[in-house]
């Protein structure tokens, strides 16, 4: 996401981040106004990106050998220059266009490859279909959403929706998908995202742990918020379901939970589990207030743990 003065420019990647976590999109929006800092990429992430770039370049060479009439859109140019170059290349009918760039209002994005097909369009007896490389061998719905976005943007130039779109996985296998089967979902999600961005000031949104956290560039910012608020999710080994149940009883911080009378908690949580979490919350509160680490010895249960060792 790019924010310039009062304008917000979004991409298919931003759309995927929004689907994964609304708060990611909110942090993207507030990055500069609130001085938020992105998490530095780990060595694993750097390696993953390098493999992704190599995978893309590998297929660029393969496709260039197959389609000699090809062109690369210069990614260092301005958005408008890239878009105009893409339109020009499409109208000239290049068989392969690498890094085609699309603009529809404030929605814009760059496709890995678009390849000429024999489908009739406003251009004549041809149109284009999207091919996008992914280093992963296990494709996800977000990957399909991304190529659907590019296919939609192509239709704004050609006047016709591409029939197919392709994902090239880490095994170099091609996965075709019918654009028409995913278009409505894409439009719904895009509309929802745009509505979200238009009224973020009126929304009461708080970061929650989710599957996206481990890959999120804003993870450190959320951690700072949780630590500052002493949020209930800081209790070790507590899960999302348990958090939601405790919050319904007003127990939204570690301190409130630690001070709560277990007998008055009506949440449907296994008794032993609730007692363990409560004990853990008290230990963490002790550490937070005194700076000293305390430990409780857990009662031994015959037949479990070290008792199972020969």
Residue ranges: model-predicted function:
Residues 1, 134, 138-142, 153-227:
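Metal-dependent nuclease catalytic regions and adjoining charged, substrate-binding loops involved
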Residues 1-123:
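Metal-dependent nuclease catalytic cores that hydrolyze phosphodiester bonds in DNA/RNA
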Residues 99-101, 110-116, 125-137, 146, ...:
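Active-site ExK catalytic segment of metal-dependent nucleases
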Residues 119-124, 156-160:
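Secondary-structure transition/capping motifs at alpha-helix termini
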Residues 217-245:
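Extended, structured, electrostatic nucleic-acid-contact surfaces
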Residues 240-310:
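N-terminal accessory regions of nucleic-acid-interacting proteins
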């Amino acid at each position: 996401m790019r924010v310039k003065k009062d304008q917000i420019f979004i991409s298919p990647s931003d759309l995927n981040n929004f689907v994964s976590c609304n708060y990611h999109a909110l942090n993207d929006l507030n990055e500069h106004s609130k001085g938020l800092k992105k998490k530095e990429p780990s060595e694993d992430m750097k390696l993953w990106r390098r493999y992704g770039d190599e995978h893309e370049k590998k297929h660029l060479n393969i496709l260039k050998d197959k389609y000699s009439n090809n062109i690369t859109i210069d990614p260092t140019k301005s958005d408008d220059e890239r878009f105009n170059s893409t339109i020009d290349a499409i109208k000239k009918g290049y068989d392969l266009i690498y890094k085609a760039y699309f603009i529809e209002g404030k929605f814009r994005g760059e496709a890995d490859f678009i390849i000429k097909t024999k489908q009739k369009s406003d251009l004549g007896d041809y149109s284009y279909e999207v091919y996008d490389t992914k280093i992963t061998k296990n494709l996800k719905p977000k990957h399909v959403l991304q190529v659907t976005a590019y296919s939609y943007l192509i239709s704004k130039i050609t006047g016709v929706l591409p029939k197919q779109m392709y994902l090239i996985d880490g095994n170099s296998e091609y996965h075709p998908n019918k654009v028409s089967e995913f278009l409505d979902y894409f439009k719904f999600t895009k509309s929802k995202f745009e509505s979200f961005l238009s009224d973020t000031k009126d929304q009461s949104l708080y970061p929650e742990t989710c599957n996206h956290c481990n890959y999120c560039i804003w993870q450190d910012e959320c951690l700072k918020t949780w630590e500052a608020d002493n949020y209930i999710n800081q209790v070790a080994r507590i899960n999302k379901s348990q958090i939601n149940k405790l919050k319904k009883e007003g127990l939204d911080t570690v301190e409130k939970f630690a001070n709560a009378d277990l007998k008055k908690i009506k949440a449907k949580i296994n008794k032993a589990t609730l007692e363990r979490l409560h004990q853990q919350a008290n230990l963490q509160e002790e550490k937070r207030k005194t700076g000293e680490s305390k430990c409780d010895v857990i009662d031994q249960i015959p037949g479990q743990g070290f008792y199972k060792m020969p």
